[in-house]
Amino acid sequence: MAAEVYFGDLELFEPFDHPEESIPKPVHTRFKDDDGDEEDENGVGDAELRERLRQCEETIEQLRAENQELKRKLNILTRPSGILVNDTKLDGPILQILFMNNAISKQYHQEIEEFVSNLVKRFEEQQKNDVEKTSFNLLPQPSSIVLEEDHKVEESCAIKNNKEAFSVVGSVLYFTNFCLDKLGQPLLNENPQLSEGWEIPKYHQVFSHIVSLEGQEIQVKAKRPKPHCFNCGSEEHQMKDCPMPRNAARISEKRKEYMDACGEANNQNFQQRYHAEEVEERFGRFKPGVISEELQDALGVTDKSLPPFIYRMRQLGYPPGWLKEAELENSGLALYDGKDGTDGETEVGEIQQNKSVTYDLSKLVNYPGFNISTPRGIPDEWRIFGSIPMQACQQKDVFANYLTSNFQAPGVKSGNKRSSSHSSPGSPKKQKNESNSAGSPADMELDSDMEVPHGSQSSESFQFQPPLPPDTPPLPRGTPPPVFTPPLPKGTPPLTPSDSPQTRTASGAVDEDALTLEELEEQQRRIWAALEQAESVNSDSDVPVDTPLTGNSVASSPCPNELDLPVPEGKTSEKQTLDEPEVPEIFTKKSEAGHASSPDSEVTSLCQKEKAELAPVNTEGALLDNGSVVPNCDISNGGSQKLFPADTSPSTATKIHSPIPDMSKFATGITPFEFENMAESTGMYLRIRSLLKNSPRNQQKNKKASE
């Protein structure tokens, strides 16, 4: 491949280089056709001359186009100007390759460049190995490839097609260390991303501000100031780390300036909170069912016609979005606080019922022409819009009745619950209400396993069930009661004749969970004093024969709920006969002996005394139709074994209702607390007990008690 291509002197092309303005216009020779005889004699007509003239003009235009194409190729082949090299043999251009618009040149362009670069590397390696090798200095000679146009193209093709078929798309000058591309590399499928070596350039941003038009000024927002110390003004540390003494006036002034600057930089939205009330005020002018003048203009309707969406609503129904706004949803949470009331209690299945949605009928929207009658003077054009006439089921009052009947309000539901509780004789709710009306003080102390007979009573008197396996060994005779005694039930009357208000307050309506350690200790001392006084008063009394106590039984709690009702002799004898096979022998001996000085007799006497006091007001004791009495006293048999009626079973009895669920429902997955570190915990409580006395909660209690 030759180093240069020689086309001759440039002056040869100058006669063809005329500017467009200086191009002479063809002047047509006008021939006068006055005499037809002269035309025939000369043998040359006007038609032939005009045809020759047209051909000459086409030839001139074609030569000018070829001249411009040759000039462009000559500019491509000329040596680049402005490049100065020290050694033209090594530093000058190695070769120049012209890439034509051919599929082969586009496909193998990268391989051609790699071949040239490999040649340069091979030459450099040879120079390193043999420096003294003679180099060939050839004279410049014309290129072996002649840039000629393909003359096989038909002459009928236009000049424009020839240009497109033989246009140069790339011209690369290869030097030793670099290459110079004058026209650009060819693109693969005209896509620079698919062509190797092509990268989309990334330009640096020169203008950081908006360029304004002539005569206009653009207000540029102030930049947010950098945080700095409000005390000394340094940006290296914050105010909390400032070593300088604090200047309150300067700090306040700088903080205010910083906040103002931040507010201006953020368009007065710096550290502003989002409130729902602002949204309501913002869209407060929009009301459902009310069409404003702007909306009428936007819809293209007047106040003398119904909006088109009204006719569509007749087919789709009431908008579900506004129906959602009218929902009143109950949380379904039930509060078990142990208090006797119907406000925070729920029955079985009541939570699922409360989850049903209710609606506030006052929030139903009025839509004239949909759920209320169309105003007078406004026509109903439902046929034009392809809709349906007003439906009676979509009227507001009919829709409200539908919501009321299918989605009951909370008040109606609670009323139904009360009526159902009163109508069912064996429901737990009815039993609870009866116990509340009777004012039973020990209703909360009943065991959850204790049951009462159902409405269907049997003619037989109650019988004791066989004793359960003992949890703890029975206490021997003469053993004093244990140190820990349960607190008195809620509402238990005082056990001593003393009428002091302190005693009534301690044993009154104070919840045992809210008592402090000192109050519990004081209550324990009062219980012991009451037991000692009962022992001294009833030291000469004998225990009745039919007292339901075993020889080593200990009362777990006082039994104020048992009715002291007279029992016929026949019933008594029958009861004794039924009790003999099942009651242990020690029970008969102990009941006949009647030891008055033992703790069993003391507790029995105390239970009898309280029975006599509470008999007029207690209706909880289950008096059967045949006159037998079902005791409500929680009595232990053999230490911790309860005695229950014989005919008590799940099929014939209902469990006594308690507002607090059974502990077994809360004990799943709970690890029992082992009292290993109780000494440290108790000591810590005793240390901070003085601080707890002055707590706001205790101060409120003392204030209420004093009032």
UniProtKB/Swiss-Prot annotation:
Changing P186L: In PFBMFT5; decreased levels of mature TERC in patient cells consistent with impaired function in RNA processing; decreased levels of mutant protein in patient cells. Residues 456-465 have a biased composition (Low complexity). The C-terminal part (659-707) contributes to MTREX RNA helicase activity, in part, by enhancing its RNA-dependent ATPase activity. Residues 659-707 are annotated as: MTREX binding. One of its GO terms (biological process) is mRNA 3'-end processing. This is Zinc finger CCHC domain-containing protein 8. One of its GO terms (molecular function) is RNA binding. GO terms for cellular component: catalytic step 2 spliceosome; nuclear body; nucleoplasm; nucleus; TRAMP complex. There is a cross-link at K413 (Glycyl lysine isopeptide (Lys-Gly) (interchain with G-Cter in SUMO2)). Changing D662A: Does not alter RNA helicase activity of NEXT complex. Phosphorylation at Thr-492 by GSK3 is triggered in cells entering mitosis; this phosphorylation is greatly enhanced by nocodazole treatment, but reduced by lithium. Residues 549-559, 598-607 have a biased composition (Polar residues). InterPro entries: NEXT_complex_subunit_ZCCHC8, PSP_pro-rich, Znf_CCHC. Pfam families: PSP (PF04046), zf-CCHC (PF00098). Component of a nuclear TRAMP-like complex, an ATP-dependent exosome regulatory complex consisting of a helicase (MTREX), an oligadenylate polymerase (TENT4B or TENT4A), and a substrate specific RNA-binding factor (ZCCHC7 or ZCCHC8). Several TRAMP-like complexes exist with specific compositions and are associated with nuclear, or nucleolar RNA exosomes. Identified in the spliceosome C complex. Component of the nuclear exosome targeting (NEXT) complex composed of MTREX, ZCCHC8, and RBM7 that directs a subset of non-coding short-lived RNAs for exosomal degradation.
